[in-house]
């Protein structure tokens, strides 16, 4: 199985998502973050489960949609996947954001 490495910025993204949602509902914030985390675990078993990020169009940079969030990840090699960002689907994503 492939190891999944969370970048510092992806961890920060997850914290910001939690804090934003928790302002209204701590319970829903926990549910949302747990859902994202569990879907990320599925990437380790099937790295190509996500689609190629349309804005980037590189085979190794992919995304998995979880609710209204895009989990952007890079297949670094046969043994490692890096979680690059977690973006709300309404936000624009440019190469400079990775």
Q: Each predicted region: which residue ranges?
A:
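Basic, Lys/Arg-enriched alpha-helical interface segments
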Residues: 3-60
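Basic/aromatic recognition patch in beta-strand/loop cores that engages polyanionic ligands
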Residues: 49-77
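Enriched for short, Lys/Arg-rich terminal
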Residues: 66-69, 74-98
């Amino acid at each position: 199985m492939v190891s999944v490495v969370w970048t510092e910025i992806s961890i920060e993204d997850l914290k910001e998502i939690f804090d934003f949602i928790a302002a209204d509902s701590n319970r829903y914030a926990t549910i949302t973050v747990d859902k994202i985390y569990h879907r990320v675990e599925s990437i380790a078993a099937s790295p190509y489960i996500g689609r190629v990020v349309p804005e980037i169009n590189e085979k190794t940079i992919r995304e998995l949609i979880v609710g209204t969030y895009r989990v952007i990840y890079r297949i670094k090699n046969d043994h490692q996947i890096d979680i690059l960002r977690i973006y709300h689907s309404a936000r624009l994503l440019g190469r400079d954001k990775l």
